[in-house]
């Protein structure tokens, strides 16, 4: 299982204080992947704007290291966390977009997933052709289960969500997303609906995600909550509030509604719903 830093972003696993200079120093410790892993996560979590942050994360993104017995980190863990961190940094990370685009073709499934999500967060329009190409074979190939593992051949949910986040409305984009509306996995269907709601604004896609809030699997309900929150689709307010899931996740989804771009002043009903969960 991958080492996951705790919720406290100011302390390392050993309990010593960590700040931006220390995180930058640790990211350069090529012989200590656990320190690099934590440092990359910390810099992303804190949305570091230091001039060296993107430079060092781009270097870390190129690091490849298989998981070894006794390690506390997953395969290519430093590169994966570097990819995730870059997506959180905003415009300062623009120079890393070519690196993330290249990473979309990496053999590492988890690394492709992290790169796709970050390209979506960075609104990298240059990524659209590659994202479409990765999904073009549809559920029968890209969306098929990879032999010997529970994962799909492509990280379809991440690729679909990136297309929605980037927001390029073209026929080829809409067509490839439509391919996954009836995927056997509800989480993938939710990602496709999320993307189409973002791209078209059509309420039918929001309604399909709301229906998934009643799914018997908690994992599916969680995914639909996060997808609805990401779209900021206001009609889902009551359904989100009443979903059988953790209040913490419902609060995240409701915050997405409160922060939607076309509603600069948070709606009182959303704030009341959030207060009721606290």
Model-derived segments and their meaning:
Residues 39, 82, 115, 156-159, ...:
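Conserved hydrophobic register position within alpha-solenoid helical repeats
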Residues 36, 75, 79, 112, ...:
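Residue-level detector of extended alpha-helical repeat arrays and alpha-solenoid scaffolds
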Residues 34-45, 59, 76-85, 114-117:
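Non-membrane alpha-helical segments in proteins
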Residues 14-27, 48-69, 91-105, 124-146, ...:
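Amphipathic alpha-helical scaffolding segments comprising HEAT/armadillo-like alpha-solenoid repeats
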